[in-house]
Design a protein with these regions (language model features):
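Extended alpha-helical targeting/anchoring segments
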Residues: 1-457
């Protein structure tokens, strides 16, 4: 047993017979989470994080946060700006672990978290922000093949858990039985309705608002287990960010190719992604497709606009002269696609919290449009905001580190209904008929990813 501080205890075990999925299935408890990264993605993350049985939860609606303690059963209501409240409520405990996340909050922030009064009506009635706070976290190191159990006491006097027993549970425990799932899709909005939205949005574009992102929700009935659905999705569509998080009355799962923002100490890291191209079937085709993606003038222009917007956005939370494009228009590979991405870094301003950085980057450009303020106003006035799908999911560590991924391709499961969405960026050059065909194709391809031996019943 190691101690990194008076409040933090650790135990390391050999992981050569374990996987993050197996650990999750053996871990006993409620409101479990799994955050992982695909080894099939070049430059994938080194660590996976697993946890269960949070100490408390924060649930935000409009201008108030409900804080619920699982220890006492008490609920406390706090009024004010959601991010100001979160900064005040989130525990901050320093430690010297080498891991980016060793305990803290896991959850999501939706589109409306930065808007106290919104006229938009989201079809999934979920909180604007929702976080569970975990004192005990399991870290899987894919490089050293080790698993580290970490417990951080929020209250110094609280009794510590037995990490030896937890290690025994993970190494020899009985995992949950294999489960299956199937689904039956149904339409939530017709193509005619979406075409009307596209046409109306296109007509409003001008020099002040050059692009706006619209979303089309589609639904399916789920029969079976949500975690089986996640396992199928991660197998068919691995990505740098893969997540499965259980809440009281819903589950959020998905695989995302794109980070929204990271904060590591004083460093703020954004990786804007714009431009995709299918993978080739051979190494030679991959290189040829990379060349086509890189040499596409329209994609490069659009990518440059996004990078410029991200740099400008970071000026509100970073020293201006510290903001630099470290990597420009780099091509990254996922299992199915090539992505053009850049890396922008800056140094956070003193006295600011990582949550200030997160607030400054929401809603993401990828889910709203450019310029952000004008696109946001338009979507809210026309009741077309995308709720959780227009936000981000990730962790906020006790140590102040933060890492969030975009949630546009998430699946939200509530009352056996799967909520999903397609998005399209509308410009003055958008061909409505072509967009409708592409959206329908995207929906079919996404549902096909979830099929297993026929999958759909």
């Amino acid at each position: 047993m190691q101690s990194t501080s008076s409040r933090t205890k650790m135990k390391t075990i050999n992981a050569d017979s374990l996987t993050p999925i197996l650990i999750f299935r053996r871990l006993q408890g409620n409101r479990k989470f799994l955050l992982e990264s695909s080894a099939q993605h070049e430059g994938a993350g080194r660590f996976s994080f697993i946890g269960a049985n949070p100490r408390k939860t924060y649930k935000g609606f409009g201008d108030e946060i409900q804080e619920y303690s699982y220890k006492t059963g008490n609920t406390y209501t706090h009024k004010g700006d959601l991010f100001v409240l979160l900064k005040r409520l989130m525990p901050r405990i320093s430690n010297t672990t080498q891991f980016p996340f060793s305990g803290g909050a896991v959850g999501y922030v939706g589109h409306d978290a930065t808007t106290i009064l919104s006229t938009a009506q989201d079809k999934v009635q979920l909180p604007d922000v929702h976080f569970h706070v975990y004192e005990t976290v399991i870290v899987f190191d894919h490089v050293t093949d080790e698993v580290t159990l970490i417990h951080t006491n929020i209250d110094a006097e609280k009794k510590e858990p037995n990490l030896e027993e937890l290690a025994e549970q993970l190494l020899k425990g009985r995992e949950d039985e294999d489960t299956t799932c199937s689904y039956e899709p149904f339409e939530s909005i017709t193509n005619e309705q979406f075409a009307t939205s596209l046409t109306s949005s296109k007509a409003t574009l001008d020099e002040d608002m050059t692009r706006v992102v619209l979303s089309k929700r589609f639904l399916a009935n789920l029969q079976g287990d949500a975690f089986a659905l996640y396992r199928q999705l991660r197998k068919k569509h691995p990505a740098p960010y893969m997540y499965y998080v259980e809440f009281e009355d819903h589950v959020v799962l998905g695989t995302s190719p794109e980070s929204l923002i990271r904060v590591q100490g004083e460093r703020v890291i954004a990786t804007p992604t714009e431009g995709t191209y299918p993978r080739g079937s051979t190494k030679g085709q991959d290189l040829e497709h990379e060349r086509k993606l890189y040499e596409n003038t329209n994609i490069r222009k659009s990518h440059a606009v996004l990078v410029s917007a991200v740099r400008q956005e970071l000026q509100s939370v970073c020293f201006r002269d510290s903001i630099q494009v470290i990597e420009a228009m780099r091509i990254e590979r996922s299992k199915h696609a090539l992505h053009m991405t850049s890396r922008v870094e800056g140094q956070i301003l003193p006295m600011l919290h990582a949550l200030d950085v997160l607030a400054a980057t929401l809603p993401p450009f990828a889910s709203i449009g450019i310029p952000k303020d004008q696109a946001k106003d338009y979507l809210e006035k026309s009741s077309q905001t995308s709720g959780i799908f227009g936000g981000a999911l990730g962790f906020i560590g006790f140590n102040g580190h933060l890492d969030f991924a975009l949630t546009g391709k998430s699946i939200v499961i509530e009352n056996e209904t799967m909520h999903m969405q397609s998005t399209v960026t509308v410009t003055k050059y958008t061909n409505v008929k072509e967009v409708l065909k592409q959206v329908e194709k995207d929906e079919q391809e996404f549902l096909q990813l979830l099929e297993k031996e026929g999958g759909q019943h």
